[in-house]
Amino acid sequence: MFEEINLGQPIELVVGITGMESLTAETVTKVRKAWTQSPERYESLFNQIEQLTLSGLECLKTGKVEELGELMNICHGYLNALQLSTPELEELVHIARSNGALGAKLTGGGGGGSMIALCQDNKDAIEAAMNKAGYKTLPYSIG
């Protein structure tokens, strides 16, 4: 089910692309195996990510962009705890945050690929820093 949300203001984003590829099926298999070995830990992480997602939706509906960024940062930590991040994704997340991103997290199936940074007025600086480090970027606005 999709729900149209009136953002009230444009949301500025930069996608950082590692150039690495990973197969979602392999990532799912890896997480499933870890989950069977420690179900309580993984169920807790899954539940926390679900709650962050619902809170993030409320932030979008109410225009709380800074809070959304904080939730993205927390979510990335949980995704990292699920062993879905890579050194390259961690570098991109660090670059984004150290250049003023409100939030940054991996996106997609994990294991490589891409991350997304929530920006304000500093989208160009974040993109330039990622490019300088050798990564491709895709800047865009929503709303």
Language model features by range: what are they?
Residues 112-114:
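Glycine-rich active-site/cofactor-binding loop and its immediate structural neighborhood
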Residues 1-104, 116-143:
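C-terminal nucleotide
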